[in-house]
């Protein structure tokens, strides 16, 4: 089983995670039954509306006469309306009714109610138990309850029973602290919507209602509304990535604006000073003395079970005796305080998990986007964002795994889940949270880089696509554009290599970079078995086998395998050299070339020998130096170009033109059966067939090998010099498909033809920024600029002499090997370089030209003598008459 299939199985088996302890479960029944273990089983004081099907008992132990709702049989509770259900399937069906009710177009038509209330039927209402008023939202209901709480004195509690379901216990996975909070949701025409008479309500003894508190298990902060509690919990646990980018980006900008910055966590304070409590509608943060006074004034109706939930040292509320015991242990053993941010934690395990956030220890990596997480639960929750069909998707773009949280979120948009209007983000405003990288002291561009894409000046994006405003790249989904902007343009480099200190944008990049230190290469090429340290490098390498170069320059037609290489190449056409040397003023268009240039100013190269004071610019040169000089062994040399390498593996990795010509030909033409060495050559060969036409077939046999340019003697056959020029039998012409219109020379690729045409047009698109000299090819400019920079990157492994051009190094190596591959066909003398042979051949050419001039002079002298001899005798009259018309026709004047 592959790694990808294993992750898929893991994702299927662990679809549900407990929001309290992050434990994973494979089914909904397991996680719901597990979450009941977090619900406290004490006898809470509940004054509420009971369902007729639920048993109601009196708590006689406390003597208060309050009603306690038993929930042993109904273990599954809906957090939307508080109704208790018997099985997970019933809970899901019940929650689906909420979805249909909140979406008008999907609602099931209901029977007409007997009496239509004045409010809208599509709104869920909240009823006040005192005055029977209905409200459309929890916020309005809560504000109304505040007026009753401030105006009503405290009296003996009395039960209030109505005919509709209520929340009798705490929600699953949340903290419910207060005990006398009751409310009812009434729907138009729904059952159990009967309101008692006014006489019955006047006889009721109204009690002081304590508000429900939702306590965060991470920071102990209390909330009144479940929606606020869920929104706060999202600050501790990352939510899934939304499918639509724009709403999420707007929320991020609004949440991070300086005018309104939300506080996700309270200020870190010692455990003895925690004062997060809300009673009787008063503000959170009263002192301990005031809380104890209010608790004493409320009477002893709380019972012993309620008093056990208060810490005697700091008067903090807790949900269960287990949490209280853990808190008391923090008083005995001391609080667990973070040494970096001074935040206090109740247990050492929570502190260890928090310290992992500071150290960026994320052991669970997402294989899709490279983001890292500290726990497997967070990774699995994040992986759901990559699924094509999220479980619950909101029209605003957010996705949810939990249906209850999805229902709470939809209520924030209003009726039917319609998104609220949001203010669009200005295009030029940067993404919040990702600051611009600070410029370095030296080597940074002094001017902004010009756009290198051909689509920069194009019009608006095509319908259904999203264009990046920085690089004009288009994407099919808004989520892809978001990830591109965050991880390419704005993401800061916050992941550091522990060995060399290099910074990276993603954790996965650090992981791939560490393989350069360890030497691990776990990704081999299936074609040549060459290993690589990352899948991206393997994908780039495989382009060399296929011959594909998808990135082509629009100015010179040169193609590249990487988009970054094309962008750097186009800087040459744009005359943009942003990287300037501070010492000599020479500019470069690539930062690594500036870095290599600086070594020549300092005189110290990065790779130093440990046994001698010599240093080298390349690691390969250092390894060859240690092998030859210190170890006394011979390096591995390339038989084609003579380059030396320290190992056979490095020699196999080396690629040169001569070795490529000798490579086995594995690509066969389907028309003529010819085999070539690469897919690019096969494509050019097939183009030659297409250019030849359907009636012509290229010769299957290759033509006779042409003699090298150095061994071909210039042929001179002057006509009329006393000899006849014999033409050699013409070989069958082999067309290649691309022909020069000026000189009819054939080429196999479009790039070669465009470079050749510059010879006829005189175009030189690569000028030198230092001296102004222009060149036809970028490689010629690159070699020329080394004359200005003094850079000599090609050093001999034997004597250490450095050269600016690799060809000069190859010629220099022949001094040590004694090789002389270039021989003169006239005299047989051999040379180490082609330039020396060319100079020698000029002497033979001069001798040949002198001989030709001598032959011409002798021929002219012989012709002159013949004219002088024949001009003495006069022509007969008849012949003169015949010659005269011919002479006039040719424009020759005959004297005499």
Curated annotation (Swiss-Prot):
Residues 274-287 have a biased composition (Basic and acidic residues). A zinc finger (C2H2-type) spans 16-38, 76-98, 126-148, 214-236, 309-331, 336-358, 364-386, 392-413, 466-489, 495-517, 523-545, 551-573, 579-601, 607-630, 636-659, 667-689, 738-760, 766-788, 794-816, 822-844. May be involved in transcriptional regulation. This is Zinc finger protein 574. Residues 707-732 have a biased composition (Low complexity). InterPro entries: Znf_C2H2_sf, Znf_C2H2_type. Residues 247-257 have a biased composition (Polar residues). GO terms for molecular function: DNA-binding transcription repressor activity, RNA polymerase II-specific; RNA polymerase II cis-regulatory region sequence-specific DNA binding; zinc ion binding. One of its GO terms (biological process) is regulation of immune system process. It comes from Macaca fascicularis (Crab-eating macaque). The modification Phosphothreonine is found at residue 724. Keywords: DNA-binding, Metal-binding, Methylation, Nucleus, Phosphoprotein, Repeat, Transcription, Transcription regulation, Zinc, Zinc-finger. Belongs to the krueppel C2H2-type zinc-finger protein family.
């Amino acid at each position: 089983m592959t790694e990808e299939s294993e992750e898929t199985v893991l994702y299927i088996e662990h679809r549900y995670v407990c929001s309290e302890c992050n434990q994973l479960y494979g089914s909904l029944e397991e996680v719901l039954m597990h979450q009941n273990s977090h619900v406290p089983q004490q006898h809470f004081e509940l004054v509420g509306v009971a369902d007729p099907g639920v048993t109601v008992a009196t708590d006689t132990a406390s003597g208060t006469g309050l009603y306690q709702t038993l929930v042993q049989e109904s273990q599954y509770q809906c957090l939307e309306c508080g109704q208790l259900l018997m099985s997970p399937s019933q809970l899901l069906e019940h929650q689906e009714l909420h979805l249909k009710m909140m979406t008008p177009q999907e609602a099931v038509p209901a029977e007409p109610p007997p009496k239509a209330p004045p409010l809208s039927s599509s709104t869920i209402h909240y009823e006040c138990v005192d005055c029977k008023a209905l409200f459309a939202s929890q916020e309005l209901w809560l504000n109304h309850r505040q007026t009753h709480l401030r105006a009503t004195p405290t009296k003996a509690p009395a039960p209030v029973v109505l005919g509709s379901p209520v929340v009798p216990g705490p929600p699953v996975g949340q903290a419910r602290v207060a005990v006398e909070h009751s409310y009812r949701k009434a729907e138009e025409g729904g059952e159990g919507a009967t309101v008692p008479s006014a006489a019955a309500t006047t006889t009721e003894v109204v009690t002081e209602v304590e508000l429900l508190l939702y306590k965060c298990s991470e920071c102990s902060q209390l909330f009144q509304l479940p929606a606020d509690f869920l929104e706060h919990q999202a600050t501790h646990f990352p939510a899934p990535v939304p499918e639509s980018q724009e709403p999420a980006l707007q929320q991020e900008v609004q949440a991070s604006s300086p005018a309104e910055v939300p506080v996700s966590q309270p200020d870190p304070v010692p455990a003895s000073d925690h004062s997060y409590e809300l009673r009787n509608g008063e503000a959170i943060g009263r002192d301990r003395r005031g809380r104890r006074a209010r608790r004493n004034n409320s009477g002893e109706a709380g019972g012993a079970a309620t008093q056990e939930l208060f810490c005697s040292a700091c008067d903090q509320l807790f949900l269960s005796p287990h949490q209280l015991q853990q808190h008391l242990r923090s008083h005995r053993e001391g609080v667990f305080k973070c040494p970096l941010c001074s935040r206090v934690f109740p247990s050492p395990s929570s502190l260890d998990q928090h310290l992992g956030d500071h150290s960026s220890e994320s052991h669970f990596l997402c294989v899709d986007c490279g983001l890292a997480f500290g726990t497997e639960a967070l990774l699995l929750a994040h992986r759901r964002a990559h699924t094509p069909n999220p479980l619950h998707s909101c029209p605003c773009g957010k996705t949810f795994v939990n249906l209850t949280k999805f229902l709470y979120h939809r209520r924030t948009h209003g009726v039917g889940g319609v998104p609220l209007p949001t203010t669009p983000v200005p295009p030029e405003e940067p993404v919040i949270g990702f600051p611009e990288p600070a410029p370095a002291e030296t080597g940074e561009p002094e001017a902004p880089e010009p756009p290198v894409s051909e689509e920069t000046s194009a019009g608006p994006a095509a319908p259904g696509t999203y264009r990046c405003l920085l690089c004009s790249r288009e994407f099919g989904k808004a989520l892809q554009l978001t990830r591109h902007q965050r991880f390419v343009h704005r993401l800061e480099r916050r992941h550091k290599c522990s060995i060399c200190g290099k910074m990276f944008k993603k954790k996965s990049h650090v992981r791939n970079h560490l393989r350069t230190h360890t030497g691990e290469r776990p990704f081999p090429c299936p074609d040549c078995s060459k290993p690589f340290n990352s899948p991206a490098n393997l994908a780039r390498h495989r382009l060399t086998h296929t011959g594909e170069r998808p990135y082509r320059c629009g100015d010179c037609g040169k193609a590249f395998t990487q988009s970054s290489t094309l962008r750097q190449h186009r800087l040459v056409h744009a005359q943009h050299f942003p990287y300037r040397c501070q010492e000599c003023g020479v500019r470069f268009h690539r930062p690594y070339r500036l870095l290599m240039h600086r070594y020549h100013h300092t005189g110290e190269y990065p790779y130093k020998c440990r046994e001698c004071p010599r240093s080298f610019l390349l690691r390969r040169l250092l390894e060859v130096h240690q092998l030859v000089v210190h170890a006394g062994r011979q390096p591995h040399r390339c038989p084609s170009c003579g380059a030396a390498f320290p190992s056979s593996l490095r020699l196999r990795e080396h690629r040169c033109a001569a070795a490529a010509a000798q490579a086995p030909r594995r690509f066969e033409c389907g028309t003529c059966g010819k085999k070539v060495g690469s897919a690019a050559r096969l494509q050019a060969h097939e183009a030659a067939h297409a250019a030849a036409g359907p009636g012509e077939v290229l010769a299957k046999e290759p033509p006779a090998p042409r003699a090298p340019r150095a061994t071909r003697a210039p042929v001179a056959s002057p006509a009329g010099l006393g000899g006849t020029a014999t033409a050699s039998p013409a070989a069958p012409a082999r067309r290649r498909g691309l022909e020069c219109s000026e000189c009819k020379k054939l080429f196999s690729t479009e790039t070669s033809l465009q470079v050749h045409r510059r010879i006829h047009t005189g175009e030189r698109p690569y000028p030198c920024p230092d001296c102004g000299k222009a060149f036809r090819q970028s490689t010629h400019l690159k070699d020329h600029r080394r004359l200005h920079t003094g850079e000599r990157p090609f050093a001999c492994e034997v004597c250490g002499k450095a050269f600016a051009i690799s060809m000069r190094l190859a010629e220099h190596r022949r001094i040590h090997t004694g090789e002389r591959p270039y021989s003169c066909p006239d005299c047989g003398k051999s040379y180490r370089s082609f330039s020396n042979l060319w100079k020698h051949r000029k002497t033979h050419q001069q001798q040949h030209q002198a001989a030709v001039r001598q032959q011409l002079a002798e021929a002219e002298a012989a012709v002159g003598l013949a004219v002088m001899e024949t001009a003495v005798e006069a022509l007969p009259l008849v012949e003169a008459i015949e010659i005269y018309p011919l002479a006039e026709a040719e424009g020759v004047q005959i004297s005499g």
